[in-house]
Amino acid sequence: MKYVITENRLVNLIDNYLEDSVGRLRKFPLDHINAREDDFELSDDSGETIFTYFDYGLGVEEKLYVKMLSLFNLNHKELEKLLEKWFTKHYDGMVLSVYPIIE
């Protein structure tokens, strides 16, 4: 059975998923030589970096990125668009690109 879900509803689902799977995110200034004043990272309670906002790009922890692709059955472009909307909703920053953080 297929359902039609609005984009706003999907952003809310991503909101709930991140809250349930990652927990509360804490914002820290980005400690990088080329970081702008507005750049930062979002870490979970254990201190692991989940998102990095650097030079208008949003880096997403690789395992989380892959899980979200699979769980929501999205392609990369669709996930990038949703994460961009989620980020703008919560952190009011302009995102030009979204990418997995590969370590």
What kind of feature is each model-predicted range?
Residues E7, D20, L42-D45:
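Intrinsically disordered, low-complexity segments enriched in Ser/Pro/Gly/Ala and basic residues
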Residues M94:
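Positively charged interface segments
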Residues M1-L18:
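Short acidic, low-complexity intrinsically disordered linear motifs used
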Residues Y3-T6, S97-E103:
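Short acidic DE-rich linear segments
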Residues S21-L30:
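Short, charged/polar N-terminal "headpieces" of proteins
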Residues H32-K89:
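Acidic, low-complexity, intrinsically disordered interaction modules
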Residues P29-H32, P100-I102:
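Short, surface-exposed recognition loops or helix-turn segments adjacent to catalytic cores
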